[in-house]
Amino acid sequence: MANASEPGGSGGGEAAALGLKLATLSLLLCVSLAGNVLFALLIVRERSLHRAPYYLLLDLCLADGLRALACLPAVMLAARRAAAAAGAPPGALGCKLLAFLAALFCFHAAFLLLGVGVTRYLAIAHHRFYAERLAGWPCAAMLVCAAWALALAAAFPPVLDGGGDDEDAPCALEQRPDGAPGALGFLLLLAVVVGATHLVYLRLLFFIHDRRKMRPARLVPAVSHDWTFHGPGATGQAAANWTAGFGRGPTPPALVGIRPAGPGRGARRLLVLEEFKTEKRLCKMFYAVTLLFLLLWGPYVVASYLRVLVRPGAVPQAYLTASVWLTFAQAGINPVVCFLFNRELRDCFRAQFPCCQSPRTTQATHPCDLKGIGL
């Protein structure tokens, strides 16, 4: 009796595991599509977000949504086939197509984040050049096209082969049978791009830290021969006193070193405090997205290195499954991170969707005049 009940128990456990896996994949798919589509609509509808950084973020969110829509249903289908024993994982053509799409979206995110890091550095370190040349939509369009072109060149032809029978990774990262180091080149290029992105942000951190050092003010004394103070250290008080009628003697000379601030193109100053805070918030948000990309793709890249360089069985199956699921989670986590790190996005979201506001916020936004109705 005990032996007869064991197969049924194992079958029930496998069915429960399959149901949990399909439910989790469905949840990831829905969260990714809902978050990325909502984020894209917010950027398109809000005019204050029509700037180059948010255009790049829009492209990143659309790519994540397409990746979730293309890859997660294939993983769900492979899981159902493996559980029902209805056939092997996808054939050679299907496996190469899935491998190409996975490599394309992965490299697109890596190259786009590298371009974003470079533009963030220019926005802080060379703000005048960035404001004149790179702040519009043409720069964002060029970066997006370059990211897609480089990703297409890196992912085509597919270098991944169907080497595993696991339903989580039906197209596992394997070395080619003829010994061509295709998968190894794929991994090395990805590591170089991600490492270069973090080096750019590290250089930006050093730049901000060097400019935060307090330097003592060097006071230049004003020149005075007849009580009319002028020169580099003059504050204009003597001229103001003379104009008000408190002075005697000749008219003081014009102050040196004061340039009139006009509305022209050359009148734009360096990075002021509010602009600096806005650029810093954008840098924090994009670096959080870049760091999460490294943390969620890092375990899978390490496992792939071990499978390519050592042997396919060198990686424990539990670690490989967990690393693959982390890459699935990366497709839907970017909108959450952006809303957490960017106050401007939260304000625009409340303005575009008033139904999501709390009652206290709504009452503060639309006050009611009780005296006007006699209360």
From Swiss-Prot:
The subcellular localization recorded is:
Cell membrane
Membrane-spanning parts? 24-44, 56-76, 98-118, 140-160, 182-202, 286-306, 321-341
Give residue ranges on the Cytoplasmic side: 45-55, 119-139, 203-285, 342-375
Main localisation: membrane
Q: Topology relative to the membrane, per the entry? A: Multi-pass membrane protein
Q: Extracellular topology: which positions? A: 1-23, 77-97, 161-181, 307-320
Family annotation (Pfam families): 7tm_1 (PF00001)
Q: List the disulfide bonds.
A: 95-171
Carbohydrate attachment sites?
3
Annotated Gene Ontology cellular components are: plasma membrane
- Keyword list, A-Z: Cell membrane, Disulfide bond, G-protein coupled receptor, Glycoprotein, Membrane, Receptor, Transducer, Transmembrane, Transmembrane helix
Q: In which tissues is it expressed?
A: Highly expressed as a 3.0 kb transcript in brain, ovary, testis, heart, prostate and peripheral Leukocytes. Lower levels in pancreas and small intestine. A 2.3 kb transcript was also found in peripheral Leukocytes. In brain regions, detected as a 3.0 kb transcript in all regions tested. Highest levels in the caudate nucleus, putamen, hippocampus and subthalamic nucleus. Lowest level in the cerebellum.
Q: Which GO terms describe its molecular function?
A: G protein-coupled receptor activity
Q: PROSITE patterns, alphabetically?
A: G_PROTEIN_RECEP_F1_2
Which InterPro entries does this chain map to?
GPCR_Orphan/Phoenixin, GPCR_Rhodpsn, GPCR_Rhodpsn_7TM
Please give the biological process terms from Gene Ontology that the record holds.
positive regulation of insulin secretion involved in cellular response to glucose stimulus; positive regulation of phospholipase C-activating G protein-coupled receptor signaling pathway; signal transduction
**Is Transmembrane among the key words of this record?**
yes
State the similarity comment: Belongs to the G-protein coupled receptor 1 family.
Primary role: Orphan receptor. Possible candidate for amine-like G-protein coupled receptor.
Q: What is this protein called?
A: Probable G-protein coupled receptor 27
Query: Which species expresses this protein natively?
Result: Homo sapiens
Task: Give the gene symbol.
Answer: GPR27
